[in-house]
Amino acid sequence: MPTVSVKRDLLFQALGRTYTDEEFDELCFEFGLELDEITSEKEIISKEQGNVKAAGASDVVLYKIDVPANRYDLLCLEGLVRGLQVFKERIKAPVYKRVMPDGKIQKLIITEETAKIRPFAVAAVLRNIKFTKDRYDSFIELQEKLHQNICRKRALVAIGTHDLDTLSGPFTYTAKRPSDIKFKPLNKTKEYTACELMNIYKTDNHLKHYLHIIENKPLYPVIYDSNGVVLSMPPIINGDHSRITVNTRNIFIECTGTDFTKAKIVLDIIVTMFSEYCENQFTVEAAEVVFPNGKSHTFPELAYRKEMVRADLINKKVGIRETPENLAKLLTRMYLKSEVIGDGNQIEIEIPPTRADIIHACDIVEDAAIAYGYSNIQMTLPKTYTIANQFPLNKLTELLRHDMAAAGFTEALTFALCSQEDIADKLGVDISATKAVHISSPKTAEFQVARTTLLPGLLKTIAANRKMPLPLKLFEISDIVIKDSNTDVGAKNYRHLCAVYYNKNPGFEIIHGLLDRIMQLLDVLPGEDKGGYVIKASEGPAFFPGRCAEIFARGQSVGKLGVLHPDVITKFELTMPCSSLEINIGPFL
């Protein structure tokens, strides 16, 4: 979830009242948000860089608020305040309007060359806006939040904001060879070619993460005004000539990208959030975008649409019994202007341009549940019998895990996938004899097959912890996978218990004693009768000759124990003797 940092006092001033930390935390919870942290700029720097670096930093209290990833309208102070005020019914949701300019409309002309790299662009103008330092900071921060969220780190959409009074339209969005693009980028003192900029920004902590988007392309996107002044080279950097400041009065906004829908959403969010500060509140000046095919379209769309949802559907999905009128009121509090129409069971909802997250009826139902309050929904027993019970094999696993730990062994959780070498070559077995399930297109050599034994995972864990004090006593109780043509999926899982003892001496007696303890816990007595267990001398390629035994219990073979062969130990990069035990616990249910 994205986190929005807002100044507490500025937030309370905008909300028109002061809250205690506990009260504001409760308000956030009611609105479906979470107050994640109460901190300050000084405290943040102190934690990350130390007290010396924090000297002189601001002590202003900051609220860090977790916002749902699809609520782009809450990524800045303006949207957050507006949403909370509507939720508390202190104000009505504003109506956003697109207006035509008094004079000539600003045009953005897209050329055919952009189709090879970033084919889409939209634009708009915020006219007669009044910034303060805090408003300006919020404007810049919203762009960054959108870049990291819906824009997918500028891969889908990149935002450019420019001082319109320093430019002359119409504007041209085209693509050129890097060597043909030259301009003075933001915060630089001289001009550079695009090639030079890409080299410079490879060491820039902020911009280096975006270079890969275009650096290997033959053409780079660029936007010019009618005088040939570069506005920006999206998605990397804006030009310094048109940089905006606190004193900027007219802003030209362009959004370029590879996703047309998201570009329109991003533009709508920016202009709706900050048109509040325009001379004519909540009005946005239109801009015309001319596409390569000659067709033109006016942006921003600021489209309102209406959806119909039945009241009984909301009640059923949420588990409440509210009248259609009350449900309409709840939805209106969530920035979704609603009214009851028709037969009295239909609710008409107006979706504003700020709520791009409303895609389906279930999104409307969710907002109704939030406004009603999850804590107010009564707990009820389901109409169908759905009482769960623990799976017997998992219950046995949990009991054994606790007792293995009580015996002094440390639990390890290893990957279910491994390399062919781990389960075959290193254990002295041919891969065809393992009945392993193979991954058709493994992304790495470490994940080629599903494990057929837990032993390699534990030995690799020991290898990664060789510096730890001896002895190392590890165990794992997890599934292995074996091919089985008799099952519908062609494979079957078996729950295995594996334990290893690694020390200067093999410690076979410790592993043997552990086996006796496990059988005692499973209520299996020693003996060759049908209900007992016995170990018999055996051989295995992974074990030292004459130091291996097969375990029989309840009339069947359930596993092996013994001292590992020196070759196995060496192949897993170990240097000390090691004993192991591995059994199938399924037959003991």
UniProtKB/Swiss-Prot annotation:
One of its GO terms (cellular component) is phenylalanine-tRNA ligase complex. GO terms for molecular function: ATP binding; magnesium ion binding; phenylalanine-tRNA ligase activity; RNA binding. It catalyses: tRNA(Phe) + L-phenylalanine + ATP = L-phenylalanyl-tRNA(Phe) + AMP + diphosphate + H(+). Its EC number is 6.1.1.20. Mg(2+) binds at residues 357, 363, 366-367. It comes from the Eukaryota. SUPFAM superfamilies: Class II aaRS and biotin synthetases (SSF55681), PheT/TilS domain (SSF56037), Putative DNA-binding domain (SSF46955). Residues 302-379 form the B5 domain. One of its GO terms (biological process) is phenylalanyl-tRNA aminoacylation. Its cofactor is Mg(2+). Its main location: cytoplasm. Keywords: Aminoacyl-tRNA synthetase, ATP-binding, Cytoplasm, Ligase, Magnesium, Metal-binding, Nucleotide-binding, Protein biosynthesis. InterPro entries: aa-tRNA-synth_II/BPL/LPL (IPR045864), B3/B4_tRNA-bd (IPR005146), DNA-bd_dom_put_sf (IPR009061), Phe-tRNA-ligase_IIc_bsu (IPR045060), Phe-tRNA-synth_IIc_bsu_arc_euk (IPR004531), Phe-tRNA_synthase-like_B3/B4 (IPR020825), PheRS_beta_core (IPR041616), PhetRS_B1 (IPR040659). Pfam families: B3_4, B5, PhetRS_B1, tRNA_synthFbeta. Coiled coil: none annotated. It is found in: Cytoplasm. It is an enzyme of class 6 (ligase). NCBIfam families: pheT_arch. Belongs to the phenylalanyl-tRNA synthetase beta subunit family. Type 2 subfamily. Heterotetramer; dimer of two heterodimers formed by FARSA and FARSB. This is Phenylalanine--tRNA ligase beta subunit.
